[in-house]
């Protein structure tokens, strides 16, 4: 088998399996509305300087990613969202188990398909994470015992339907080699042998 035929075959194989998926930043520029223990006035948002008032439970994602987006009105918890879908809840004090629940409506962000616990530091008990609908998530922190500045992290992800396929590096290289082989074959004026 000639080299150019081998290159053509390798290029076709590489193109057939070279796609990888890149997930877009799902919370970039998101406007998030939150409730704490079922009450809108239980959450204080960054856009309102964490002060109570109408609409204080809605805030945009912090573009500097330097602080939390929400504080609970009892100042027990700070809630931080990152643009790549990581949610972190931080206890500002030692917090005994009690009835603590939070809901977050992510507004126009991409639909959430998975919400998984990724880490816990300085707390005991298991929080309950749930997806209410494609844009709303809930945390039930009842039965969780928090030490001061303990935290939990959870990852929000979108499904494969929103992933953007991109060709992998090997596929691009093999595609270029295939193009060169085809051009070379066309210039020679000969018909390829099978």
Predicted regions and their residues:
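Gram-negative bacterial Sec-dependent N-terminal signal peptides
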Residues: 2-20
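Hydrophobic alpha-helical membrane context
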Residues: 16-20, 178, 188
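N-terminal regions of proteins, emphasizing targeting and processing segments when present
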Residues: 17, 36, 173-176
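Mature extracellular "passenger" or substrate-interacting domains of secreted, surface-exposed proteins
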Residues: 23-163
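Short, charged juxtamembrane terminal tails flanking transmembrane helices
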Residues: 189-194
